[in-house]
């Protein structure tokens, strides 16, 4: 409820009167009336607590709802960010530092921000969009400049909510006990969702139109909420950008999560414990007593390979009942409206961190010819692919054949692009496709986009293309902030299209349909399992050479990752000498045009009898 009592906020040149709001538990708070970067008014609330601080004996536990307060809360200051590491790899380069937390780091970090267009009016019944940030489950905060919700809120007349959740070991340590149940970051998100469902009507929000949207690990989080029966009552639609619960880095088994705890225990010099029959009580006691900075400084000790984040959601039997692939296959998820998509060059950002010998920082912004030959390309690929692929020559050869550039001459840019597509498909695009396809097959309405525009204000080198995460700038309306950025007119129009599609989806479940019943000029078709139509999101001048509506995207490559390669790994044991003979023959045929690698190999296998052994299998 609102109270007629007014609070006056004194700023250097303004005095703004703000109504006091009482939450449904009676807690009073007030925000501030501000202008968007486009000059339109809104009311902003920052730092509203939705949980008790997870400190002391609450560290690693599920969050507890915030107890009511009686003194009016001044919700005009950005909240703390959750404890996390900082990216210093490229020094003070803005392209990397823009993703670092920009407020004080603290374990006391469970707060949310609310943006309301104009003045707060409980009678408005506006659609609500709840943002979940990404960051690999090890970083991220709701207060980043790129997540500033003012422009999206006022331009599309929606309410925007952005919550913090615990990351890294603080949010995802799994010890199979109430003191560290795992998925604490997911429980944080769910508690924030419950807060929204309970209170957003007081801000003018429509409880029947709550849409979750997130990017990367935030998108994986949103899709995990689609899988969890715990979350289903508290949202209605979902948007996933460049991430999915089926991404190989998004969820891990319990035994892996438990092993990580042992490795961290040893790295922190708490003791020397074996992975066989470890004493988890001692491990948990060490972590509970440890300084937060000590935990943060050692959090990466359990990492094994590229794309392996140290602390992520786990199939705990509580929040998550089964692995994501099983849920999708059996239809055990919330069938609703889903908007999903990915970017053209998803993995290049991560490759540069993982391969410093190939992409040295000293030459990063001046060179483009980092990979000049096949030998160096294969070396880089072997440093990036997961172990279960590398341990079998046949599966490695299959991946190399799928992605090795075929057109001659092969340029350094071709080698980089092939590596990027290989890892981008595996870690991002194909998992988003998998989620979209399953949602469609089980009766949900799905819309798919593919972002292909490299922004004029992009600070990363041109050879990196359309990077992971950089659709966010357009969705939150950054190009419209002309006082700070110098985007082109076409890019401002693209940003308007992004915002309109996203807001329409939140309002009506259809990105084409405006709230007044009219439709957008460009028709975005529903995604289906046959034609797999998607909207190519780019500037208008690109369309003559590029189709507005595509099919896939990356459907052939994703069939390789999601169908062919898993079947190959499951079916083939140690292939031994027949493979080597076949490989020699393939080398001789290298200059011939082979239209279907799989067909030729299958023909060859008909005349061979594979030697079976007790050695490790490709699919093990």
Swiss-Prot record:
Cysteines joined through disulfide linkages: 82-109, 270-286, 430-558
Pfam families linked: COesterase (PF00135)
An annotated GO cellular component: synapse
Annotated EC: 3.1.1.7
Positions annotated as glycosylated: 74, 272, 486, 536
Molecular function, one GO term: identical protein binding
Main enzyme class: hydrolase
Active site: residue positions: 216, 346, 468
The keyword GTP-binding is assigned to this record: no
GO biological process, one term: acetylcholine catabolic process
Catalytic activity entry: acetylcholine + H2O = choline + acetate + H(+)
Keyword vocabulary terms for this entry: Cell membrane, Disulfide bond, Glycoprotein, Hydrolase, Membrane, Neurotransmitter degradation, Secreted, Serine esterase, Signal, Synapse
Signal peptide: 1-31
Protein's cellular compartments: Synapse; Secreted; Cell membrane
Membrane topology label: Peripheral membrane protein
Key word Signal present: yes
Family: Belongs to the type-B carboxylesterase/lipase family.
Subunit structure as annotated in this protein's UniProt entry: Oligomer composed of disulfide-linked homodimers.
Function: Rapidly hydrolyzes acetylcholine and releases choline into the synapse. It can hydrolyze propionylcholine and butyrylthiocholine in vitro.
Name of the molecule in the record: Acetylcholinesterase 1
Species this chain originates from: Caenorhabditis elegans
Gene from which this protein is expressed: ace-1
């Amino acid at each position: 409820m609102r109270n007629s009592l007014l609070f006056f906020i004194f700023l250097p040149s303004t005095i703004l009167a703000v109504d006091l709001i009482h939450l449904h538990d009676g807690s009073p708070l007030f925000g501030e009336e501000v202008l968007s970067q486009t000059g339109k008014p809104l009311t902003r609330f920052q730092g509203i607590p939705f949980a008790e601080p997870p400190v002391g004996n609450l560290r690693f536990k599920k969050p507890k709802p915030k107890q009511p307060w009686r003194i009016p809360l001044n919700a005009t200051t950005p909240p703390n960010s959750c404890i996390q590491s900082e990216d210093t790899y490229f020094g003070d380069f803005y392209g990397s530092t823009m993703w670092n937390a920009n407020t004080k780091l603290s374990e006391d970090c469970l707060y949310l921000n609310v943006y309301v267009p104009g003045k707060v009016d409980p009678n408005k019944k506006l659609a609500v969009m709840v943002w979940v940030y990404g960051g690999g489950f090890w970083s991220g905060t709701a207060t980043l400049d790129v997540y500033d919700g003012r422009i999206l809120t006022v331009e599309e007349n929606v309410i925007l909510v952005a919550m913090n959740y615990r990351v890294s070991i603080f949010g995802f340590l799994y010890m199979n006990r109430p003191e560290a149940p795992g998925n604490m970051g997911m429980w944080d998100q769910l508690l924030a969702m419950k807060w929204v469902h309970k209170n957003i009507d007081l801000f003018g929000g429509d409880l029947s139109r709550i849409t979750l949207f997130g990017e990367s690990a935030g998108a994986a989080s949103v899709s995990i909420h689609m899988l969890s029966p715990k979350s289903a009552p508290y949202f209605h639609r979902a948007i996933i950008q460049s991430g999915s619960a089926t991404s190989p880095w998004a969820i891990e088994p319990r035994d892996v999560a438990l092993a990580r705890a042992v490795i961290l225990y040893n790295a922190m010099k708490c003791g020397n414990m074996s992975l066989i029959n470890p004493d988890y009580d001692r491990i948990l006691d060490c972590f509970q007593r440890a300084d937060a900075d000590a935990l943060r400084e050692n959090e990466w000790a359990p990492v094994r390979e590229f794309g392996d984040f140290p602390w992520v959601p786990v199939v705990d039997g509580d929040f998550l009942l089964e692995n994501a692939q099983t849920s999708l296959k059996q239809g055990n998820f919330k069938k609703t409206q889903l908007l999903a998509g990915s970017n053209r060059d998803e993995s290049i950002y991560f490759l540069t961190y993982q391969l410093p010998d190939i992409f040295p920082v000293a030459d990063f912004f001046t060179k483009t010819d980092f990979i000049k030959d096949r030998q160096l390309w294969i070396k880089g690929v072997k440093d990036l692919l997961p172990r279960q692929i590398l341990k079998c020559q046949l599966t490695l050869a299959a991946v190399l054949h799928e992605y090795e550039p075929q057109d001659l001459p092969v340029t350094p840019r071709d080698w980089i692009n092939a590596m990027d597509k290989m890892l981008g498909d595996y870690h991002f695009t194909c998992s988003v496709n998998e989620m979209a396809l399953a949602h469609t097959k089980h009766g949900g309405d799905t819309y798919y986009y593919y972002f292909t525009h490299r922004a004029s204000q992009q600070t990363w080198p041109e050879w990196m293309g359309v990077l992971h995460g950089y659709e966010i700038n357009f969705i939150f309306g950054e190009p419209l902030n002309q006082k700070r950025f110098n985007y082109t007119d076409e890019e401002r129009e693209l940003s308007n299209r992004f915002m309109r599609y996203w807001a329409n989806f939140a309002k009506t479940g259809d990105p084409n349909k405006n709230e007044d019943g009219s439709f957008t000029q460009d028709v975005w078709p529903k995604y289906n399992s046959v034609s797999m139509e998607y909207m190519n999101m780019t500037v208008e001048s690109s369309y003559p050479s590029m189709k507005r509506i595509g099919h896939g995207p990356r459907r052939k490559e994703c069939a390789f990752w999601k169908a062919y390669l898993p079947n190959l790994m499951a079916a083939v044991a140690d292939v031994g000498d027949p493979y080597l003979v076949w490989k020699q023959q393939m080398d001789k045929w290298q200059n011939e045009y082979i239209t279907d690698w799989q067909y030729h190999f299958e023909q060859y296998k008909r005349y061979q009898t594979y030697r079976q052994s007790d050695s490790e299998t490709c699919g093990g």
